[in-house]
Amino acid sequence: MLSCSSFLIFFLFSWVLLPMKSFAIPIISLDKVRLAINDGASEQLPVVIWHGLGDTPTSFTLTEVSQRVQKLTKGAVYAIRVGDNEFEDIKAGYLGKLEDQLDEVCDLIGNEDSLSNGFYALGLSQGGLFLRALAQTCDAAKIRSLITLGSPHSGINTIPGCSPTNLICKAVVHSILGLGIWHSWIQNHVVQAQYYRTEKQYDKYLENNKFLTHLNNEVLHDNYTRNIEKLKELDNLVAVSFERDDIVEPPYSTGFGWINETTGENIEMEDFVLYESLGLKDLVNQGKLETISFPGRHLQMRWGDFDALVLKYFKDEKEEKTELEESTRPSNFLSTYFVSPLVSAIDGTVDYLHGKSLFPEKRNFKELTMRKRSIVTPEDSEEVYPYISEFVAASNVSEEKGPKSFANLAFITIFSHFFYHIDDMWRSTLGLFSLIPQIIGIIYLTVMFTGRELDTFMQFGGQVVNEFINYVVKVSLKYPRPADIEYGVGYGMPSSHSQFMGFFSAYMIAWDYKYRRSQCFSMLSFAKYAIYLTLSTFVCSSRYLLDFHYLTQVVYGYMIGFGVGLFWVYLVGKLRSLGVTKWLLSLPPLQFFYIKDTIPHSKDNHKRQWLESKQFKNQKSN
C-alpha cells in the first residue's frame, strides 16, 4: 500500500485535473504470467492474483510473486489489472465504485475458458478483500482455495496512514474522516471509503456504506443467505495476518477480528459479529477457515513460508520436491576473475575477525534469517506452524530471500525506498537518513550539468561502477537480509547504501590528498572530512537499526566502497597522466557541451571565479 500522500495526489489529479472521461468504468483484464514451462499442457488449476493498493501486476514484486507461484504449482497464473495501463490500474485502487469493478472482473472470468473448471486465488492486501467479494457474489468465480495476505476483511477505521512528520497529510485525512467519509459521492468513488468502518459512528456506517455492510452481512439484504452459502463452497479460506501490520488499521481486521475502539483491546474473530453473520463459525467447524499470523509488518514474510502456503493450498498434486530456478548469475569472466577472489577475501576476513573475537557475532546467515525476532526454523516450526514444516521439508525450497532481477536491484540500489513508520518519529528519522545517498546523487547531477567538469563526471562514473560491483557481489554471495526486512527486497551482503557512502567518503578524502595535498591538513579540510564521515555514520546506522541489514553487511559494504573509492582516485589520476582525459575532451560530444577539466589543475577555483565575477560587476557599474 502507498502512503496517504499518494492517496491525496491521485485523488486530486484524477478527479480535478484529468478529463471527464475518467468517470467511465475502467477496462479490466487478466494478464497471464508466462514462463519457460508448458503451462498449457498442465492439468493443474490456475491461480488468479489480485494485487494491493498502489501496486500493479507488472511491478517488480508482483511479477516475482506471480512467477514464483507458477514455478511452484507448474500451472497458469493470471493477475487482475483494472485499466488499460499501469497508471489506470493504480488509480482504480484508489478511485472507483467497487461493485462496478467486481462486476467487470466477474464477466471477464466467466469469459476465460481456462478458469471455467475452477481456480485458486491469492489476494494481497485489499486485493484479498476483493477476491472474497468475488467468491461471494460472482457465480463464474469458482474459487477452490483463497489465500489473503494482510487483507482488511472486517474493514479499516482509518485511511492508510501518513508519516508522523507529514502534518498536512494528517490534517487532510482528519478532515475527510470527520466531515465527508459518509457522503454518497465519497462512498461511491473512493475505494478505501467503501470498506471504512468505525463503531464510533456505527449507525452512519450501517446507513451509508453499501459495500462492506452487505459483503459482511452486517445489515439485512437480498443476498444475505447467498453470501454465507457461497463462502461454504470454498475448500479453504486462509486469512494471513501480520502482528505488526502498520498499514491495515486495526490489524486484527485481517483475521476477521476487530478492536475495541474505546479500550484498544483486541476482539478475536470468535467474539466479533462476522463470526455469526457471515457463517465463519460453520467454516471453522468444517475445517475450511484458517487464520495464520506472522510476526512481521504488512506483507512481510519469508519466501519459505510463502512457498509453504502455496504448496499446501494451491498445488493439485503434492510432489516430493519442488525446486525454483536460480537467479541470473554473473558471467563466467566476472565470476572467475573478480567475484570469486572478492568473495573469498570477504569470507576469509570474516573468519579472521571472528577468530580475533572482533566480530563474535559471525553468523550463519540462513539460520539467522529463520530465527531472528521469532521467525521459526523448520525444526521448531512444527510447534508453532505445524502445517508449514511438512511442506518446507517436502519442497526443499530455499529459505533465502528470493532473487531479484537486475532492474529491480538497480532501482532499489540507486533510488531505493523506505517505509514510513506510523507514530514512530525515531524510525521515520532513521528512514530519512537512508535517503542521504539519493540527495548526494541529486547533487552529483546538479554539479555535472552546471559545472561541466570532467572530473565530476569521472567521480559519478565511479559511483555507478561501485553500484554494479555491489550488485555482482550480492547475487554471488546470496546472503539474505534480516527476517524483519519488508517482503521481497533482495539480498543483503553487502549493503549498497553503506558501499555508496564508503566510496563517496574515500573519493572525496583521497582526491583532496592527491590534488590539494598542501591544504588537506588544514582545519577546514578536517571539518569537511568530519562531515563526510558523519553522513556515512548516519546512513550506515540507519540501515542496521531499521533492520535492513545485519551489522556485518553494513561494515563490509562500507569497507568495499571505501576500497573502490581509493582505487578510483588512483585510476582517474593514471588516466589523466596517460593523456586519456585530454583525448576525451577532444571528442566532439564533450566539446559541444563545453566539458572541461580545470578543477585538478587550479587551486582556489571557486574563489578565483568569485573574484572575477566581482571585478566584472565593478567594471560594468563604472
From Swiss-Prot:
Keyword Transmembrane carried by entry: yes
Domain of life (superkingdom):
Eukaryota
Q: Which SMART domains match?
A: acidPPc
Q: Which SUPFAM superfamilies match?
A: Acid phosphatase/Vanadium-dependent haloperoxidase, alpha/beta-Hydrolases
Q: Which residues are glycosylated?
A: N223, N260, N396
- What keywords is this UniProt entry annotated with? Disulfide bond, Endoplasmic reticulum, Glycoprotein, Hydrolase, Membrane, Signal, Transmembrane, Transmembrane helix, Vacuole
Its GO CC terms?
endoplasmic reticulum; endoplasmic reticulum membrane; vacuole
CDD domains attached to this UniProt entry = PAP2_dolichyldiphosphatase (cd03382)
Provide the topology term for how it sits in the membrane. Answer: Multi-pass membrane protein
Keyword match Iron = no
State how changing S125A affects the protein, per the record: Sensitive to vanadate and elevation of external pH
- Which residues does this entry assign to the site Crucial for post-translational processing? R373
Q: Which Pfam families match?
A: Palm_thioest, PAP2
Mutating D245A: effect?
Sensitive to vanadate and elevation of external pH
Q: For this protein, what reaction is catalysed?
A: S-hexadecanoyl-L-cysteinyl-[protein] + H2O = L-cysteinyl-[protein] + hexadecanoate + H(+); a di-trans,poly-cis-dolichyl diphosphate + H2O = a di-trans,poly-cis-dolichyl phosphate + phosphate + H(+)
Q: So which stretches are on the Cytoplasmic side?
A: 427-428, 512-519, 574-622
The record lists the effect of R373A as:
Abolished cleavage of the linker domain
Q: Where would one find the signal peptide in this protein? A: 1-24
Instruction: Give the family from UniProt.
Output: In the N-terminal section; belongs to the palmitoyl-protein thioesterase family.
Name the PANTHER family on file. DOLICHYLDIPHOSPHATASE 1 (PTHR11247:SF1), PALMITOYL-PROTEIN THIOESTERASE/DOLICHYLDIPHOSPHATASE 1 (PTHR11247)
Its job: Essential protein. Removes thioester-linked fatty acyl groups such as palmitate from modified cysteine residues in proteins or peptides during vacuolar degradation. Required for efficient N-glycosylation. Necessary for maintaining optimal levels of dolichol-linked oligosaccharides.
Please identify the protein, giving its name as recorded. Palmitoyl-protein thioesterase-dolichyl pyrophosphate phosphatase fusion 1
